[in-house]
From Swiss-Prot:
InterPro entries: 6-PGluconate_DH-like_C_sf (IPR008927), KARI (IPR013023), KARI_C (IPR000506), KARI_N (IPR013116), KARI_prok (IPR014359), NAD(P)-bd_dom_sf (IPR036291). The gene is ilvC. The keyword Protein biosynthesis does not apply. Mg(2+) 1 binds at D191, E195. It catalyses: (2R)-2,3-dihydroxy-3-methylbutanoate + NADP(+) = (2S)-2-acetolactate + NADPH + H(+); (2R,3R)-2,3-dihydroxy-3-methylpentanoate + NADP(+) = (S)-2-ethyl-2-hydroxy-3-oxobutanoate + NADPH + H(+). Mg(2+) 2 binds at D191, E227, E231. Its EC number is 1.1.1.86. NADP(+) binds at Y26, G27, S28, Q29, R49, S53, D83, E84, I85, Q86, G134. Residues 183-328 form the KARI C-terminal knotted domain. Signal peptide: none annotated. It comes from the Bacteria. This is Ketol-acid reductoisomerase (NADP(+)). Belongs to the ketol-acid reductoisomerase family. Pathway: Amino-acid biosynthesis; L-isoleucine biosynthesis; L-isoleucine from 2-oxobutanoate: step 2/4; Amino-acid biosynthesis; L-valine biosynthesis; L-valine from pyruvate: step 2/4.
Length: 340
């Protein structure tokens, strides 16, 4: 079902005016939301545990508190800590300091949708989910536009939750480029599916498989890297700018013919069935349970996955080749880190 895109002219609310806003967490999304809202004229404080993020928030000029104290002081509390620690932060520091009429916000529906956080019935619960990482939310705001966002309301005892969500999205710059209404269920399940089946899980394993096929057939690993990984950005940029049509128009007839002939052989019906199974695991809560259980055990599976991935030949080859390509390594890695 199609939904209508909203823009700044459609957001005729001032629900954040006169309110004290606490951004909980000062990592990838936290720093962007906080700085954009402050630059939009809103009263923002930071709630975060003592450590690197606490120091960084103070350095950036914010009044910074422990999470519980920030929750007490604020009218609107936006939880932007990593998914896996939100439930503990909420139970230990946020919940004891919530009171009727306050609003609780999220940028991803994971903990609310799967029931790891259960807000009191007299507290508004809303979501504003930018469709991009925090450094882009901040950078595009400073450049005069923004990143599109989804917004949703989970519960609305005050009758003002939707206005808060819309004004928040406007304050971080998203209304400049477009807002789409959703639900916590829809955002959570679609976001997880996109990450797992296409954007990360699907893409990285497709690249890895292509690299292995070429190198196992005797082709030079350096050439294989360029063919299946390095050129990926060039293709994705074209798709990003103008869809499949622009990408195909920008490539040779040989490449386009091969796309149509071989693509369905590689990504056949069985892949779609596997995707459906992955979606079912997300919808049932199976993936969420596995993720939370792994976190609670100290992330043994995630750490093992990371160690295995670090040993891949394509990663070693890529690290060497990128040393000779400074143009692909100019970003500040610190902008991509997520601090708890």
């Amino acid at each position: 079902m199609a939904v209508e895109m909203l823009y700044e002219a459609d957001v005729k609310v001032a629900a954040l005016d006169g309110k004290k806003i606490a951004v909980i967490g000062y990592g990838s999304q936290g720093h962007a939301h906080a700085q954009n809202l402050r630059d939009s004229g809103h009263d923002v404080i930071i709630g975060v545990r003592h450590g690197k993020s606490f120091d960084k928030a103070k350095e950036d000029g914010f009044d910074t508190y422990e999470v519980g104290e920030a929750t007490k002081l604020a009218d609107i509390i936006m939880v932007l800590a990593p998914d896996e620690i939100q439930k503990d932060i909420y139970k230990d520091e946020i919940a004891p300091n919530l009171s009727a009429g306050k609003a609780l916000g999220f940028a991803h529906g994971f903990n609310i949708h799967f029931g790891y956080i259960k807000a009191p019935e007299d507290v508004d619960v809303f979501m504003v989910a930018p469709k991009g990482p925090g450094h882009l939310v901040r950078r595009t705001y400073t450049e005069g536009f923004g990143v599109p966002s989804l917004y949703a309301v989970y519960q609305n005892p005050t009758g003002n939750a939707e206005n808060i969500a819309l004004d928040w999205a406007k304050g971080i710059g998203s209304a400049r480029v477009g807002l789409l209404v959703t639900t916590f269920k829809e955002e959570t399940e679609e976001d997880l599916f996109g990450e797992q089946a296409v954007l990360m899980g699907g893409l990285t394993h497709l690249i890895e498989a292509g690299f292995e096929v070429l190198t196992e057939a005797g082709y030079a690993p350096q050439l294989a890297y360029f063919e299946v990984l390095h050129e990926m950005k060039l293709i994705v940029d074209l798709i990003y700018e103008g869809g499949f049509k622009k990408m195909r128009q920008s490539c040779s007839n040989t490449a386009e013919f091969g796309d149509f002939v071989t693509g369905p052989r590689v990504i056949g019906p069985e892949v779609k069935e596997n995707m459906k199974a992955a979606l079912a695991d997300i919808q049932s809560g199976k993936f969420a349970r596995e993720f939370v259980e792994d976190h609670d055990a100290g992330f043994p599976r995630l750490k093992a996955f990371r160690k295995e991935a670090e040993g891949l030949e394509i990663e070693k080859i890529g690290a060497e080749l990128r040393k000779a390509m400074p143009f692909v390594n100019q970003n500040d890695d610190d902008a991509f880190k997520i601090y708890n």
